[in-house]
Swiss-Prot record:
Pfam families: 2-Hacid_dh, 2-Hacid_dh_C. One of its GO terms (molecular function) is glyoxylate reductase (NADPH) activity. One of its GO terms (cellular component) is plasma membrane. It catalyses: glycolate + NADP(+) = glyoxylate + NADPH + H(+); (R)-glycerate + NAD(+) = 3-hydroxypyruvate + NADH + H(+); (R)-glycerate + NADP(+) = 3-hydroxypyruvate + NADPH + H(+). CDD domains: GDH (cd05301). HAMAP family: 2_Hacid_dh_C_GhrB. InterPro entries: D-isomer_2-hydroxyacid_DH, D-isomer_2_OHA_DH_cat_dom, D-isomer_DH_CS, D-isomer_DH_NAD-bd, Glyo/OHPyrv_Rdtase_B, NAD(P)-bd_dom_sf. The active site is at R237, E266, H285 (proton donor). Catalyzes the NADPH-dependent reduction of glyoxylate and hydroxypyruvate into glycolate and glycerate, respectively. It is found in: Cytoplasm. PROSITE patterns: D_2_HYDROXYACID_DH_2. This is Glyoxylate/hydroxypyruvate reductase B.
Amino acid sequence: MKPSIILYKTLPDDLLHRLEAHFTVTQVPNLHPETVARHAQAFASAQGLLGASETVNRALLEKMPALRAASTISVGYDNVEVDALTARKIVLMHTPAVLTETVADTVMALMLATARRVVDVAERVKAGEWTESIGPAWFGVDVHHKTLGIVGMGRIGMALAQRAHFGFTMPVLYHARRRHQEAEDRFNARYCDLDTLLQEADFVCVILPLTAETRHLFGATQFARMKSSAIFINAGRGPVADENALIAALQNGEIYAAGLDVFEQEPLSVDSPLLNMSNVVAVPHIGSATHETRYNMMACAVDNLIDALQGKIEKNCVNPQAAG
C-alpha cells in the first residue's frame, strides 16, 4: 500500500503523476483550519506534506500524527516551525540550489532599474512627458565600477558577486556570519563588518533569511550610515529591514533609491508610501518567478519528498538531526 501525502499546491500534470506513482495523493487548496477539518482523515494518515507559502505550525502538526516529512517549494522556510518538526522527528526539505541564478538575475535587474531609473523614466515616456531631448532631470547613475556590498554571502550572494565582478567590474564587499574564501579568491571580494560595508558601498544588497537575529537588522541607524548616493536592494525577506525606517531614509534623502522584491507585509498595501516614490522600484516577490525556475523548484520538491520518505536526506534537508 502506498504512503499517503497531502499536496497543497497545484502541480503540472507530469509532476503530479510522478507523485502518484509513489503515493496516494490528497490535494487541498490550503492548510487553513477549515480545510484540515474537512479532510481530517487524510491529514491524520498522511506521511508527507508538499506545497508552498502556507503556515506549518504546531497546531497543524497535532492534526497530522503520522507525518514523517514535509517538502516546501521554496528555499526559505520562515513560515514553518522547524523546531516543532524536529521535536516530532519530521524532516523538512527545501529547494535551495535550483533558484540561485534566477534570483541573482532579479537582484541585478533591481540594481540596474534603480540606478538608471528605468521604471520612472519609462512611466514618464508613457505619460507623454518626453517632448524634447532629455536633460539631467532624466539621468540616473552608473552601475559599472561602483562598489557592491553584499549582506549574506550564500549561493545567491556568490552568483551576484560573479555578475558584478566579471560583468560590471564592480569591487565587491561582503558581510556574513563567516568569511567565504571562494568569494575572496574568485571575485576579490573583501570581508568587512556591517558598518564598514554600509559606509563604503554604493549598492547595499541584502540576501538574508528571516531569523530572530536578522529581523530589523536594517533600521534608522543603518540607513543613516549609508552614503546619500547609495542604493538599497532587499531580495531576502521583507522584515530584515524596518520598512518605516526605510521610508523615512528615502523621504529624507539619506539614501538615493531602493529596489525591493520583498516587504514586511505581502502583498504590499496600496497605501504604502513606497508606491508614491519615483526612486523606488517595487516588485511583487518575483525573485525566482520565471516559468523555468518555478517548474524546477516544484520538480525538486517532489523529488525531495520521494527521497525523504525513502530515508534519503543527504541533500536539501533543513533539519537532518530530525532523522537521527
